[in-house]
Amino acid sequence: MGSQNSDDDSGSSGSSRSGSRSVTPQGGSAPGSQRSRRSGSGSDRSRSGSRSSRSRSGSGSPRSARSGSAESRHSQLSGSARSKRSRSAHSRRSGSARSRKSGTPESPQSHRSGSLQSRKSGSPQSRRSGSPQSRKSGSTHSRRSGSAHSRRSGSARSRKSGSAQSDRSESRSRSHSGSLKGNEESRSNSPNLQIDVERANSKSGSRSRSRSRSGSRTSRSRSKTGTPSPNRSRSGSASGSGSDVGVPKKKARKASGSDQEKKKSGSDSDIEESPTKAKKSRLIDTDSDSNQDVGKKAPAAADIFGDADDISDDEDEAGPAARKSPVRSKSRSQSKSHSHSRSMSHSRSRSRSRSRDKVESQVESAPKEDEPEPLPETRIDVEIPRISADLGKEQHFIKLPNFLSVVTHPFDPETYEDEIDEEETMDEEGRQRIKLKVSNTIRWREYMNNKGDMVRESNARFVRWSDGSMSLHLGNEIFDAYRQPLLGDHNHLFVRQGTGLQGQSVFRTKLTFRPHSTESFTHKKMTMSLADRSSKTSGIKILTQVGKDPTTDRPTQLREEEAKLRQAMRNQHKSLPKKKKPGAGEPLIGGGTSSYQHDEGSDDENAISLSAIKNRYKKGSGAGQAEVKASTIYSSDEDEGSDFEARRSKKVDKAKASKALRDSDSESDAGSAKSGHSNKSGGEGGSASGSENEGSQKSGGGSSKSASGSGSGSGSGSGSGSDND
């Protein structure tokens, strides 16, 4: 029983070192144990290390105690310096002394003494070192020791740096103890056991470590009862250590859940409030640990929560029932973890191989779909009789020119109709075909020879000359045939059979025909047709109705036009109203009209107006002179008298004539208006109009003095006005 108690003591201390921060598994409701739990994993580790050494020394293994103390010292270095040293020193002194005194039968006392001493020694130090610094500034000491260093020192440092020491210490403890107690102690020393089991399980890819971190209820109950299951003792994180505490500790934590506890332990109070919250926070811790473990895979759901067999209400059950079979529970948990890791690794490898096979099959099926399937060749077997004809040795391809044509049906003199010579006849290729009636058409017929055989004959034949050239004789016409090779096999001879064609041969040569000489009828006909098409004569237009040449009678037509214009002017002046002189109205009008017409005929010269002006200024002229003057001025018949009067006027009055010329130019516009006034005045009016410097009216006045021509005087006035106009 004593050995069992010491085992329980060492197991509980080891479990508290690996996971929980409290020392007493059952009576840890004191605040000192809570503080020591909060203060960090380093101090817990130092305590648990000293306790494990204590239990080992009690069982008679001094080397294991040495290794435990050495390991506790090493874990002190990885955590916060002050708190760890103080706690480890106190716990070492108190735990080792008490355990030695008490011995193995008094293992409960060693529990109590360890817890009490740890309360006394560890809690003040943890209060000093952990809580103030964590409150102030991010707590390089306490926070690292509480959350970060608990993970590093508990899991990473215990795996990496402390691996050699743990192996050595574990081997020593096992070799010295040589019993189940030694194995339990070495397993309860959580860094050593962690590395051992992790190495064994890392090959099979197990996640039992994270499961212990996640903190199932079984881990709490088993660590509480002191069962050193490797799954639970393997974890060295703060969250795992917080979870490896019994039910009484939960109550104490809820009661004294301060801010320090939240900051350091990573929401341990929330974890104990509800199992689901605890699982979530433990999952977070396991995630942070898995980040540190490079190459480790994420934990599966089965590894985190375990199977239905692992989940049990061990918290409600009593501790002694579990204490009776520590070895059985240990082996069962180990086998379960190994089997889980194997099954998970097998299932993962299977799923990976399946996914790879699927990807490969998809990649292989993709190019197969892209390749189009070749269509099967369709063949139809048809029986067609073969046509074989003796085509001779040579076959030539002939493109008939426009001066040659072929009649395919046999010639019959009874049904033969002479061709109509139409020059616009077109062949099948749209060319104008030259019709030579019989001379350029190849015909054939069948006749019976003397032997009674039907023989074919034609009006055309080929003649081969000695130099190799050929010529075509068609009736009376001779055409030279030229042979040319055909490039390619594009021209074939086919025979029509039903709706299909049957090939007979391939044309290799081509024949072209040209007239033999320029004197042949075909050549002449060709040249004539070409001449008709090429000659373009400019057409001459013939006018059937032609009139007189308008340019021949141009002078006479001009004279006629001038006469017409003069007559029109006279008609205009006739229509003007005229005032008659009393007693001499009729002769004035009659004389005026006759003299007006005469005057218009002789207006080519300016002598008429000049002489009238000169006669106006004559003084004392006789009546005979006035008659001659009037007749000479307005008559074209008496040229001599007019000349005589002009000479006399020049001699008599040269100065007055020059003055009258200047005045007539300035006052020519009022001539016609004042002619009636001069007619009224009579003989005296002549002198009055003379004073007004109007030549036409004065000459009218002079004529009115003579008893013969008062009418002519009025006419002279109007005539001079029109002349000035």
Curated annotation (Swiss-Prot):
Biased composition (Basic residues): 82-101, 141-160, 206-223, 325-353, 571-582
Record bears the keyword Phosphoprotein: yes
Record's compositionally biased regions (Acidic residues): 1-10, 306-318
Residues found modified as Phosphothreonine: T286, T593, T632
Biased composition range(s): Basic and acidic residues: 354-369, 644-665
Polar residues biased stretches: 104-116
Lineage, highest ranks first: Eukaryota, Metazoa, Ecdysozoa, Arthropoda, Hexapoda
Name of this chain's protein: Another transcription unit protein
Keyword Signal carried by entry: no
Compositional bias per record (Low complexity), positions renumbered to this chain: 11-70, 117-140, 224-242
One GO cellular component, as annotated: Cdc73/Paf1 complex
Compositional bias (Gly residues): 710-725
